[in-house]
Amino acid sequence: MRCAIRTGVLSLAAVLSISAPLCAQNDLDQRINREADSLLATYKYLHENPELSTQERETSTLLAADLKKSGYEVTDHFGQYTEPGLNAYGVVAVLRNGPGPAVYVRTDMDALPIIENTGLPYASHVKVARAGGGEVGVMHACGHDLHMTVFLGTARMLGQLKDRWSGTVVLIGQPAEETVGGAQAMLRAGLFTRFPKPDYVLALHDTSAVPAGKVSWHAGPLLAGADSVDITVRGYGGHGAAPQAGKYPIVIASEIVVALQTIVSREMDPQLPTVVTVGSFH
C-alpha cells in the first residue's frame, strides 16, 4: 500500500508539472518519502472508519483539516441535494499561486455497504442501520480510502513546492460518488461559479489491472459515467395450481431483467462501451 500511495502522489504531482528537472524529481521523491508514514496512517484510519454515501461527515472533516494545514482556503459542507433531509459533505480547497491555469484535482470519499472479511489489522468493523431494519456493514471496497490518501499527499506536495508552479489549484472532495448524486449536488451548489472555473480536471482510480508502482493514463473520459433507476413491479400472488388468479410480480420483474439486457445488444453501437447491470432484485 505504501507503494500505491507513493506512486499516486508522484503521478499527480508530475502531471501538475512540479517535477520536471532531475534535481526537482529527487527532491519530490524525498518529500514524498518523508510524508509516507503519515499518509499510510491516514490511509489505515480512513479504511477502518468508512462512511456511506451522503454520510461522509467525519471523512470530510478529516480532509478539510488536513487541507487547511497545507495552506488551502477550505469550504466544507458544500453541496445541495434535491432529496429532503440530506446533508452535503463536499469539500472544496483552493490554493492560489499567481497567474496561470485553474486545475481541479478530485477525489471521492464514500464507502460501500459491504461487510469486510479481509482480516486486516485495520479492517472496518463499522455497521450502520439499514433502511427497512437491521444493520449493514460498511467498507472501503472500491479504493476511495487510497484515492483520498493520494489526494492529501498531492495537496501537501503542492503546498510545499509553490515555487515550482503557477496558477490556481482547486481540490475537490466529492461525496456520494457510489450513488452518483454527489457531483450533481456540488454543481447545483455553484461549484463552477463560486470557485475558479477549471481549465483542467484531474482524477485517478486504483485498479488491479495495473501492477503496483506503475500508472496508466488516458486523455479525456476513461471510466464509465453512471446513472441508476429503481423499478417497482406491483402485483399479487396466488395458488400454484391456479396461476390465472394471480398477477405475479416475480415473473414480470424477471422478464424486465432479461429485456434490459437487449438495450446493449440491440440498441447501442457495439463500438461504444456500454453496460446495463441489475444490481439488486428483491
Task: Locate the predicted segments by residue.
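N-terminal secretory signal peptides that target proteins for export/translocation
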Residues: 1-5
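Bacterial N-terminal signal peptides
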Residues: 8-20
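Residue-level recognition of conserved structural "scaffold" positions that shape functional pockets
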Residues: 15, 97, 150, 188-189, ...
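A generic alpha-helix preference that emphasizes hydrophobic side chains
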Residues: 18-22, 29, 43, 183, ...
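Acidic/His- and Gly-rich active-site-bordering loop/insert found
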Residues: 25-140, 149-166
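Histidine/acidic-residue-rich, glycine-tolerant segments that coordinate divalent metal ions
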Residues: 90, 127-139, 145-146, 158, ...
